[in-house]
């Protein structure tokens, strides 16, 4: 079974794929990362496509003719927030702290995060928040992987607006995650079958498995909200 999608939800899907294989003896190969790295292969042989949010899935449907959104499943959600350096040297405690003078901010302006920083800045309907944030944004990364690579290589960046699970991926020695209830935005992972996947009984079973109660522990482990 061949499953493709972005890097964000991939750790969850890969761990659940191994658990599914243990239970059913059906091998699930999860290929993940920036879209250009896998989209051509996915067009040829994908059973399932997963995404990090709805606009990403809608875009996949335009690029992969065999992908059907009629049987799409909305999966778990995760919060946005701010990654800062370990020990928080700039003492960033909430969203408004990254609007202060002298804070160098990076955002992801592509993939599953188009418009995310704007949504966070304007959640309280304060126009001045976006004005200040725009002045502090130094880097617009094209996707999360590019942002994480830049974070690791550029110590001049003080704060990164991104999803919670990327802090876990970076590790405690490289990142501290700040969640501000006044700015948090939630978006959901999704999964859908191709025509090939619809004919694969095991693929449909895998979709049911990743939505199951048993799977929720794994989603939670990677900072996604459990589905009760």
Which residue ranges define each predicted feature?
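Exported/periplasmic ABC-transporter solute-binding proteins
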Residues: 1-29, 36-46, 53-62, 73-228
